[in-house]
From Swiss-Prot:
Organism, as annotated: Porphyromonas gingivalis (strain ATCC 33277 / DSM 20709 / CIP 103683 / JCM 12257 / NCTC 11834 / 2561)
GO cellular component: cytoplasm
EC class name: transferase
Classification via PANTHER family: 23S RRNA METHYLTRANSFERASE (PTHR30544), RADICAL SAM CORE DOMAIN-CONTAINING PROTEIN (PTHR30544:SF5)
Molecular function GO labels: 4 iron, 4 sulfur cluster binding; metal ion binding; rRNA (adenine(2503)-C2-)-methyltransferase activity; rRNA binding; tRNA (adenine(37)-C2)-methyltransferase activity; tRNA binding
Cross-referenced Pfam families: Radical_SAM, RlmN_N
Cofactor(s) the protein requires to work: [4Fe-4S] cluster
One BP term from GO: rRNA base methylation
Protein name: Probable dual-specificity RNA methyltransferase RlmN
Cofactor annotation comment: Binds 1 [4Fe-4S] cluster. The cluster is coordinated with 3 cysteines and an exchangeable S-adenosyl-L-methionine.
Length: 352
């Protein structure tokens, strides 16, 4: 943590746009094209030290290192599940941490990344919300998760489904997506990236300013019931969210999906399935049914496979594509709703 405290005094280059990097170069007395050189070293070659930038003069590298930091730092812990899932712990400032989850599946390697330390939304079924909100991540801190996992070169997909509500940190999430998808950055196709939301205030900006896929955490088609599960329903009503989505043209390659955790005796009957089908009418979408993963001090239980399968078939009878998502990483608390860094932050406080 000492090293990170020292580098916090410097301006971080990771997360900057080509225009911003060009401004940095010009302020340093470097030629305009040096902005592109910096972008290539940061986003394509993924440099961790200015000394690696061999097509920039040694004098300029030294000047850059005095004022700027590349924003790269390693993970501090990793856990491995019996199913191959890996959970990484990243420090993001003094005494703060976030978790990222690598999910390998055949020839795919998906990284689930965090956008906030904790979360304001306080969903009943989510451990991240239970720890409260301790700040937004910068674009650099978001991107560092992607660059610094052991499998960085093998990643095929990214999902902003880790800790936090991505569209409660819209500015930095969009900055990170820009660096990921623009030709001067990593040049990823937006089709490889999915951003999850409960329907927060940044939704319209996300739809307008990016081309990435959208996943909406829904969990109940009845607003009052949803509000009990997800207090954010009060500020961000699902019906308003659906109206915004319905007004957007999803007929191209961009996709929208709805996440639905299925709770035993709560939202798993045919009445819920029929109402879910009704409120989603007019939206070309996929519904992902998710098992509830038991977390401390919460009495909710997951529906069994038979009821989930009945729910899935009912949705298909209404004309929807509906799947049951396989649970991954439950044994290391890496599955949906199980991410939390409260213990890591508590341990850091005791040791300091």
């Amino acid at each position: 943590m000492k090293q990170q405290t020292e580098t916090e005094k410097k301006v971080v280059l990771l997360g900057m746009s080509l225009e911003e990097l060009t401004t940095v170069a010009l302020r340093m007395g470097m030629p305009r094209f040096a902005g592109k050189q910096l972008a290539e070293w940061i986003y394509v070659r993924r440099a961790t030290d200015f000394a690696e930038m061999t097509n920039i003069s040694q004098a300029n590298r030294q000047k850059l290192a005095e004022i700027y930091d590349l924003g790269r730092y390693p993970w501090s812990d990793v856990q491995c599940s019996v199913d191959g899932t890996k959970k990484y712990l990243f420090p993001v400032g003094e005494g703060r941490f976030v978790e990222s989850v690598l999910i390998p599946e055949g020839d795919r390697a998906t990284l689930c990344i965090s956008s906030q330390v904790g979360c304001k939304m306080d969903c009943l079924f989510c451990m991240t919300g239970k720890q409260g909100w301790n700040g937004n991540l910068s674009a650099a801190e978001i991107l560092n998760q992607i660059f610094s996992v052991d499998e960085a070169a093998e990643l095929t997909n990214l999902v902003y489904m880790g800790m936090g509500e991505p569209l409660d940190n819209t500015d930095e999430v969009l900055r990170s997506i820009e660096a990921l998808t623009e030709p001067w950055g990593m040049g990823w196709s937006p089709k490889r990236i999915t951003v999850s939301t409960i329907g927060a205030k940044g939704l319209e900006r996300f739809l307008a300013e990016s081309r990435c896929h959208l996943a909406v955490s829904l969990h109940s088609p009845f607003p009052e019931e949803r509000r009990k599960l997800m207090p954010g329903e009060k500020a961000f009503p699902i019906m308003q969210t659906l109206d915004r989505i319905r007004a957007y043209d999803f007929s191209g390659q961009r996709r929208v999906s709805f996440e639905y955790i299925v709770f035993d005796g709560l939202n798993d009957d045919m009445r819920h399935a029929d109402e879910l089908a009704a409120i989603l009418r007019g939206i070309p979408c996929r519904i992902n049914l998710i098992r509830f993963h038991k977390i401390p001090a919460v009495s909710l239980r997951s529906s069994d496979t038979a009821r989930m399968e009945a729910f899935r078939k009912r949705m298909e009878s209404h004309g929807y594509t509906c799947t049951i998502r396989a649970s991954r990483g439950e044994d290391i608390f890496a599955a949906c709703g199980m991410l939390s860094t409260s213990k890591a932050e508590s341990s850091e406080e005791k040791s300091s």
